[in-house]
Amino acid sequence: MTKQVEIFTDGSCLGNPGPGGYGIVLRYRKVEKTLAEGFTLTTNNRMEMLAAVVALQALKEPCSVILTTDSQYVRQGITQWIHNWKKRDWKTADKKPVKNADLWQRLDKETARHSVDWRWVKGHAGHRENEMCDDLARSAAENPTQEDTGYQPS
């Protein structure tokens, strides 16, 4: 039987672009695990996306996942926009390269391994797990240790 896992993610950026981080809460049954990492120069959208990628990568086997994010960019991108981007070879409707295509491709690959139900929650509205992720992401952004090698300044 497929394991049922809940994932909560958030990204943070101190300045946009600037130092950033992600925070993740993974829950299987009643056990919670948190993950966080900080990056020296990135954007808020990249951190929101990377949180989802890393969370799904952390699952050792295909799972049934409820993934909750406060990012409409991530939720709409992976459930709606990505289909046309792939058809157009990672170009937007006006033939421009899709921003953050490296992370969209990674997220698409990880999503294919699992059955993912994407949920949205309003950020900074008292949602327990979202607040936990926000705290983790902000702390990671304040102490960045990694380089976001895929970040490309516009």
From Swiss-Prot:
Gene3D superfamilies: Ribonuclease H-like superfamily/Ribonuclease H
Cofactor(s) it depends on: Mg(2+)
Enzyme class, first EC level, given as a word: hydrolase
Domain RNase H type-1: 1-142
Alphabetical list of PROSITE patterns matching this protein: RNASE_H_1
Gene Ontology molecular functions: magnesium ion binding; nucleic acid binding; RNA-DNA hybrid ribonuclease activity
GO terms for biological process, alphabetical: DNA replication, removal of RNA primer
GO cellular component: cytoplasm
Cofactor comment: Binds 1 Mg(2+) ion per subunit. May bind a second metal ion at a regulatory site, or after substrate binding.
Annotated localization: Cytoplasm
Keywords: Cytoplasm, Endonuclease, Hydrolase, Magnesium, Metal-binding, Nuclease
Catalytic activity: Endonucleolytic cleavage to 5'-phosphomonoester
EC numbers for this chain: 3.1.26.4
Positions with a binding annotation for Mg(2+) 1: D10, E48, D70
Record-listed Mg(2+) 2 binding positions: D10, D134
Primary residence: cytoplasm
Recorded family membership: Belongs to the RNase H family.
NCBIfam families registered for this protein in UniProt: PRK00203.1 (NF001236)
Function of the molecule: Endonuclease that specifically degrades the RNA of RNA-DNA hybrids.
Subunit description: Monomer.
Name of the protein this chain belongs to: Ribonuclease H
Species name: Vibrio atlanticus (strain LGP32) (Vibrio splendidus (strain Mel32))
